[in-house]
Regions:
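Class I S-adenosyl-L-methionine
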Residues: 1-113, 122, 144
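Active-site glycine-centered loops adjacent to acidic/histidine catalytic or metal-binding residues
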Residues: 117
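Beta-strand/loop-alpha-helix module characteristic of Rossmann-like adenine-cofactor folds
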Residues: 2-18, 105, 122-185
Length: 185
């Protein structure tokens, strides 16, 4: 957005960013869809689509969040310039793993309202009073394990791993031990 567009759009909500967990029947999604102003434009990953599909209007447009992310950002930008409002579904807290941060960095002046869903690492950090920056958080949820490999090879002292239900805890432990044999349980 150009400076003039940013000034004119100040205070307007362009994107509602909705954090979710893996619950196949989320109670908050239907309420949010019914109560926020939107233009039947929705977005998220494949997994998010499968979860929210029953709650979407029949004429909903879905923008899949996938690589290359620049294509998604271009589509968001086009819609926002047309004055459209997008409802975007993401895992957990949109600022914790970054889609909201990506939007902030790349689409200057875009107004967002964020509804986070705190993930298990965040809840653990709160319970144990660990500052987020002291834990190297890695997500292997629907992603390859490259970031976990890197964290292990860098001997990060505290690694928090967000995962799907599969692979199992035993599999994740074996992975950690295979890279860092001195690791104990």
């Amino acid at each position: 957005m150009r400076t003039q567009e940013i000034v004119e759009a100040y205070g307007k909500t362009h994107i509602y960013m909705i954090g979710m967990d893996d619950n196949p029947q989320p109670k908050h999604i239907e309420v949010i869809i019914k109560n926020v102003k939107h233009d039947n434009i929705f977005s998220g990953g494949k997994r998010h689509y499968e979860i929210v599909k029953p709650f979407l209007p029949a004429d909903a447009v879905w923008i899949e969040i996938k690589a290359p992310i620049n294509a998604v950002l271009t589509e968001y930008s086009r819609l926002i310039q047309e004055g459209k409002v997008i409802v975007s579904f993401v895992s957990g807290d949109p600022f914790f793993f970054g889609f909201a941060s990506t939007i902030r960095k790349n689409l200057l002046g875009v107004g967002m309202k964020v509804f986070p869903y705190f993930n298990s690492l965040q809840m653990f950090a709160h319970h144990e009073q660990i500052p987020y920056e002291n834990m190297h958080a890695v997500s292997v949820t629907g992603r390859p394990w490259h970031e976990l490999d890197r964290a292990l090879l860098e001997y990060r002292p505290l690694i928090g791993v967000l995962t799907d239900r599969a692979p199992s805890a035993r599999c994740r432990r074996s992975k950690c031990l295979s890279i860092s044999p001195s690791t104990t349980t």
